[in-house]
Regions:
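Recognition helix of helix-turn-helix/homeodomain-like DNA-binding domains
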Residues: 28-45
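DNA major-groove recognition helix of helix-turn-helix/homeodomain DNA-binding modules
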Residues: 46-62
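Short basic helix-loop element that most often maps to the first helix and adjoining turn
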Residues: 8-23, 27
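Charge-rich, low-complexity segments
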Residues: 26, 46-50, 70-71
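Conserved hydrophobic/aromatic packing and binding residues within compact polymer-binding modules
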Residues: 10, 24-25, 35-38, 315
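Structured, helix-rich domain cores that form ligand/interaction pockets
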Residues: 3-4, 12, 16, 59-326
Length: 329
């Protein structure tokens, strides 16, 4: 993008956002004089400054820049009766589930409804293990919606039935592209972040084809072996490499295990304030000082806690049949 194209796009988006030049200047920590000169083509903004301005304006004109989802949940129940958990906790008929004579994580068998998996063992210490990965969480939302329930009532039911939360992941979907993952990765690498944990990992994934580079950047903050770490990645680019489309530009995943997962669920059920919980978990762990886009992100005051219910039983049944057929053969 040349400077004239940038100046035109900047002005159009600023006017669409309703921001004055002074308000925009305050958000991104530059002078109003500079904003005026950039907008009128009298000064050339650096590529970094252009990036910050346009990401900020895209955020300001977006109706719903962020929303929150449950992305992973696993719960262990102190019983060997998996069918009872299906009935009492999930509130479902056991006939809806396909039984498999194998399990995961050392479990003897499991029951599945779409991607909702309930694992069972004769060992009382292992108990019954409920696992909802990303697709499983969407399938569970389909069930909850049909039952006129939500995550709050479901999590309460898990605890009422003696469930122990083993893992709880929350995902912030960035719909406007405010989070600049490559820049955050570079700042973290160069000491531009304050973090309780110095462990980090930056991964580039995608396809290289001559000069046509379409790499999705992923930043892990914290140790993957710990009870709390973050995963930030460019979801739209990642999906594009798989020839899939999504409106989600970036995703910020908060991954919690064991004690941290238990504490987060208890806090959520006590306060019914997912916005406060999520931004406390983030700012208590990492900060990017003097970076305006990060300041805008952590100051965001509205984070809808949503459900995106989805279930394709036909695909689930076909996959189950193919899986069992392959194992029998």
């Amino acid at each position: 993008m040349n400077n004239l194209e940038f100046a035109l796009e900047m002005k159009n988006k600023r006017l669409a956002s309703g921001l004055s030049q002074g308000e925009l200047a305050s958000l991104i920590h530059v002078s109003r004089y500079s904003i005026n000169r950039f907008e009128n083509g009298k000064a050339n903004a650096s590529r970094e400054t252009q990036n910050i301005i346009l990401r900020c304006l895209n955020y300001c004109i977006c109706d719903k820049p962020f929303y929150l989802l449950v992305d992973y949940l696993s719960v262990r129940f102190p019983t060997t009766d998996a069918l009872e958990i299906i009935r009492k906790v999930l509130g479902m008929k056991t006939d809806y589930f396909i039984h498999y004579d194998y399990g995961y994580y050392g479990y003897k068998e499991h029951y599945a409804y779409g991607e909702i998996k309930v694992m069972a063992s004769d060992d009382e210490h292992m108990g019954v293990f409920l696992e909802l990965k990303g697709a499983g969480s969407r399938n569970m939302e389909y069930v909850l919606q049909a039952q006129n329930r939500d995550w709050y009532s479901f999590l309460n039911r898990c605890l009422d039935c003696g469930g122990v939360i083993r893992r709880f992941d929350l995902a912030i979907n960035d719909m406007c592209g405010l989070l600049d993952i490559p820049t955050l990765s570079e700042k973290y690498k160069n000491g531009g972040a304050d973090c309780r944990c110095k462990n980090y990992e930056n991964v580039q994934g995608g396809k290289l084809s001559g000069k046509n580079r379409n790499l999705a950047s992923t930043l892990y903050i914290g140790s993957k072996a710990s009870t709390k770490y973050f995963c930030l990645y460019e979801k739209q680019k990642e999906q594009a490499t798989k020839k899939k489309h999504t409106d989600i530009i970036n995703r910020f995943e908060i991954r919690l295990r064991d004690k941290k997962a238990v504490q987060a669920v208890e806090e959520l059920l006590l306060t019914y304030n997912p916005h406060g919980l999520v931004f406390y978990l983030i700012t208590d762990f990492v900060e990017f000082p003097d970076y305006p886009l990060w300041e805008i992100f952590i100051s965001h005051d509205n984070l809808p806690f949503e459900m995106n219910p989805y279930l394709s039983i036909w695909n689930a049944l076909c996959n189950g049949w193919k899986d069992r057929s392959c194992r029998q053969s």
